[in-house]
């Protein structure tokens, strides 16, 4: 009973405390992971946006410098900027009717772009057009191994305070993909999503596919969130949403970033720590029980001898005298008390015997 009671008193609170501790450890580990992924996502978004912003500033400055009434100067400016920055696959200007007046290497000059999104939106305000397949340029450029894909930047051209045309720039999507690739680290995926939740950059099995999971839905609603969820590959991931990719006055492409890490990989160190804790806890529990058992046996031996002696005295006061217990003070006092009780019982027995003998005489 002493052993069982002591074991319950020690192990039950210890188990409850250990379970609370491991739960807090797990929760703290997950929060640290989310924080790390959020920082990674924000840094990736900022780096990508700043790279795009550098190109945008060139386009915006060109919109201020180019005067469509001086096409020679416009061509010189376009040629200079195109040679200076090879990221431009195409750079050109169009009048209000959408006719290209001047362009890099003369590509598309005289062609109408009136129906192209970059032109229509560029007439109204600075614009950024999401990735799309090459259309008019497809026949002007060397045949590639893979179809050309571009993102567009556009801005209004003004003359005497009024819109006189549009400047447009086509950037090869490969440059954006290379920029995204440079943001990747082992074990962590940084995905780029379009406004309609299509994966523009990410794991090969997801590229150009719509992503219909909670984090993608949250990203499309411009909501910052961190969650653990199951992805189409059937695995659980810790996911952080960075809802916008923007910097300063860079026009929005409608992009968002998702940063994910496999839950199994992310929690491996935390689980190892928890496993080590429970192993240590188990070893300590076994050692504690062993010590408790030894202590119980240490207490039990004198108490058993004393109880046996007390039972013997009930039947025969002249039985073997109590063992002189010295293991602990209480046992010693009980032993002395039993010895005195035995002496009194034996004295009473002798007195009764004498009185019985006197009565017979």
Regions found by a protein language model. Name each.
Residues 146-184, 201, 240, 254-264:
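Conserved beta-strands of PAS-like sensory domains
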Residues 1-27, 279-286:
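Extreme N-terminal signal-anchor transmembrane helix of membrane signaling/transducer proteins, especially
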Residues 35-36, 40, 50-129:
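Extracytoplasmic/periplasmic sensory segments of membrane signal-transduction proteins
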Residues 213-275:
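Extracellular/periplasmic juxtamembrane segments that couple receptor/chemosensory ectodomains to their
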Residues 298-313, 320-349:
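HAMP signal relay modules and closely related sensory coiled-coil linkers
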Residues 72-87, 116-117, 162, 166-220:
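Solvent-exposed, extracytoplasmic
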Residues 57, 82-100, 127, 180-200, ...:
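Short N-terminal helix-loop-first-beta-strand/juxtamembrane motif that initiates sensory/input modules
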Residues 100-171:
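Extracytoplasmic/periplasmic ligand-binding sensor regions of membrane-associated signaling proteins
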């Amino acid at each position: 009973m002493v052993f069982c009671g002591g074991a319950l008193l020690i192990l039950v609170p210890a188990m409850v405390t250990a379970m609370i501790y491991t739960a807090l450890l797990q929760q703290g580990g997950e929060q640290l992971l989310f924080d790390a992924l959020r920082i990674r996502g924000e840094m990736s978004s900022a780096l990508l946006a700043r790279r795009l912003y550098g190109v945008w500033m060139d386009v915006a400055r060109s919109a201020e410098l180019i005067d469509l009434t001086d096409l020679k100067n416009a061509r010189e400016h376009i040629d200079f900027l195109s040679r200076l920055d090879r990221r431009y696959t195409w750079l050109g200007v169009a009048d209000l009717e959408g006719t290209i007046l001047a362009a890099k290497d003369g590509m598309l000059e005289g062609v109408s772009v009136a129906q192209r999104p970059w032109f229509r939106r560029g007439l109204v305000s600075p614009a950024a057009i999401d990735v799309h397949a090459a259309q008019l340029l497809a026949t002007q450029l060397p045949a590639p191994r893979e179809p050309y894909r571009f993102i567009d930047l556009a801005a209004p051209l003004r003359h005497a305070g009024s819109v006189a045309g549009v400047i447009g720039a086509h950037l090869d999507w490969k440059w954006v993909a290379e920029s995204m690739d440079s943001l990747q680290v082992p074990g962590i995926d940084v995905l780029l999503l379009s406004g309609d939740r299509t994966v523009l950059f990410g794991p090969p099995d997801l590229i150009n596919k719509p992503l219909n999971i909670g984090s993608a839905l949250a990203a499309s609603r411009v909501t910052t969130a961190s969650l653990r969820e199951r992805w189409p590959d059937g695995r659980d991931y810790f996911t952080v949403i960075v809802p916008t990719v923007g910097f300063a006055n860079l026009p929005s492409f409608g992009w968002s970033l998702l940063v994910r890490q496999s839950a199994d990989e992310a929690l491996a160190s935390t689980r190892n720590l928890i496993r080590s804790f429970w192993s240590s806890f188990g070893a300590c529990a076994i050692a504690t029980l062993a010590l408790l058992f030894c202590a119980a046996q240490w207490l039990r031996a004198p108490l058993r001898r004393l109880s046996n002696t007390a039972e013997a005295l009930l039947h025969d006061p002249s039985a073997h005298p109590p063992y002189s217990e010295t293991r602990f003070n209480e046992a010693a006092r009980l032993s002395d008390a039993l010895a005195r009780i035995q002496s009194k019982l034996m004295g009473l027995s002798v007195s009764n015997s004498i009185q019985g003998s006197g009565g017979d005489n």
